């Protein structure tokens, strides 16, 4: 079951909750919607493990949660704790920019990265989910995709957030720019009605093609893993890939078939720090997880518990610590395939102690300079403050946040995943008749090679983590930057 935020009420019999903590003995699933969580629980009831449940939930959420900035045209940060080996696994779920999307090309034609199709990246979510399913799951793609296919083909009830988000004036205007998008998301040229069944036949057809490819492979004697690969190939190398590329090109995008066909999601080791007896893991620096770890290192020097939960003093310290971490993020953090990220220095306790000296427990600062984790300096002496325009560009984005899911099975395996498709619904680009609503993650690139997030370096905005205590007690943590729970 999924545990929701709970509300305490004072009554004649003491304090009680209308939405109490939910306890499970054989597994738990938390997701962005009730149906997302139920999808994962159904997989656990059928004998699947935490990875099977997470993949199924993520596929279902990709159908039902475009208003939470997540579609099957997005990306995912995915961590898996293998209880038997007591090892945390990670997979790269962030797609790359097309090969023709160079700094010179953008500067020559636009002088910036325009919104829309020119700020997109190859979707990484399907690749990453199926890589994890193949390596650590037990089920087939068709089993994991059953609920998602059902929600796409037969529909799901339009819920309040879904209706309200689609119905905003700016989103409706952008959806109307694209006939395929308007046809799906604006039936009768208006937002879906509350409770009405929302059907996505094109998306169901795409998922069905993937299922059929797997079934054909299995029918020819292929292994479970080869069947999953066959399903993946439909999306990245087959007819669906070609139709997505054609749609992107028609929209003015810089994609070629090879941008999809050559994309892969490699496994990698996570990064981690300890915080007051807990070991906290995140994906590497293609996400912002490293900023969370730096923040925890800085905060470890304060007794937040003594200040009171969410007290002004405690919140002040957390906010200022985040600012310190973000300053280093802008200076040093990017795709480690292209940028020499000083992981050891950034994550060291010594460096955190140096950065902590800049924090005033009584006063807030608008921003901080980065430090120098290589030379162990609290402030980088070569730092030049950005212009006001650069600061505005660095903020960017849509403030609604994204979705999240967590699963744990009876064996103690667990998954923490943050799937996202930054700005997908806001830009409203459904790719032809595939039903895939495309991300706009590329808006986070810089057109300056001095920046660690320049165009060759995809940077994902989501951050999630998993933390373990003595590798026996477990929890998953999702950091939305305004509430830790």
Please name every model-derived segment.
Residues 96, 422-424, 485:
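A short acidic/small-residue loop/turn micro-motif
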Residues 6-7, 189, 241, 253, ...:
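Internal maturation/activation junctions in enzymes
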């Amino acid at each position: 079951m999924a545990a929701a935020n709970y509300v305490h009420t004072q009554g004649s019999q003491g304090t009680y909750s209308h939405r109490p903590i939910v306890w499970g003995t054989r597994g738990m699933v938390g997701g962005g919607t009730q149906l997302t969580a139920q999808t994962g629980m159904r997989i656990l009831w059928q004998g699947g493990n935490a990875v099977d449940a997470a993949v199924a939930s993520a596929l279902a959420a990709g159908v039902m949660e475009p208003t939470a900035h997540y579609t099957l045209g997005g990306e995912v940060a995915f961590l898996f704790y293998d209880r038997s080996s007591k090892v945390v696994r990670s997979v790269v779920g962030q797609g790359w920019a097309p090969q023709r999307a160079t700094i010179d090309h953008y500067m020559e034609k636009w002088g910036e990265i325009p919104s829309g199709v020119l700020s997109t990246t190859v979707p990484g979510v399907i690749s990453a989910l199926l890589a994890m399913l193949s390596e650590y799951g037990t089920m087939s793609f068709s089993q994991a995709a059953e609920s998602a296919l059902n929600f796409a083909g037969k529909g799901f009830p339009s819920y309040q957030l879904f209706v309200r988000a689609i119905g905003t004036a700016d989103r409706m205007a952008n959806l109307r720019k694209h006939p395929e998008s308007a046809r799906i998301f604006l039936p009768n040229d208006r937002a879906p009605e509350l409770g009405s069944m929302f059907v996505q036949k094109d998306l169901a057809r795409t998922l069905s093609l993937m299922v059929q490819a797997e079934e054909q492979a299995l029918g020819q004697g292929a292994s479970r893993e080869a069947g999953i690969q066959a399903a993946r190939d439909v999306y990245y190398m087959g007819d669906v890939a070609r139709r997505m590329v054609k749609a992107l090109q028609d929209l003015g995008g810089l994609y070629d078939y090879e941008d999809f066909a050559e994309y892969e999601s490699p496994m990698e080791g996570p990064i981690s720090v300890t915080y007051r007896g807990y070991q906290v893991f995140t994906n590497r620096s293609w996400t912002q997880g490293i900023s969370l770890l730096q923040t925890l290192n800085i905060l470890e020097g304060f007794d937040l518990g003594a200040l009171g939960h969410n007290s002004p003093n405690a919140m002040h310290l957390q906010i200022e610590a985040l600012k310190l971490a973000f300053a280093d993020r802008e200076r040093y953090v990017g795709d480690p395939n292209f940028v020499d990220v000083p992981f050891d220095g950034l994550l060291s306790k010594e460096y955190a102690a140096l950065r902590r000296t800049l924090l005033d427990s009584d006063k807030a600062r608008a921003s901080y300079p980065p430090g120098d984790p290589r030379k162990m300096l609290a402030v980088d002496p070569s730092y030049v403050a950005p212009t006001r325009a650069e600061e505005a560009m660095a903020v960017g984005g849509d403030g609604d946040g994204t979705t999240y899911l967590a699963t744990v099975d009876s064996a103690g395996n667990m998954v923490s995943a943050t799937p996202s498709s930054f700005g997908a619904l806001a830009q409203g680009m459904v790719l032809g008749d595939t039903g895939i609503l495309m991300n706009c993650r590329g808006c986070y690139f810089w057109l300056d090679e001095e920046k660690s997030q320049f165009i060759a370096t995809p940077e994902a905005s989501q951050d999630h983590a998993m933390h373990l205590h003595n590798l026996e007690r477990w929890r998953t943590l999702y950091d939305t930057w305004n509430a830790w729970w």
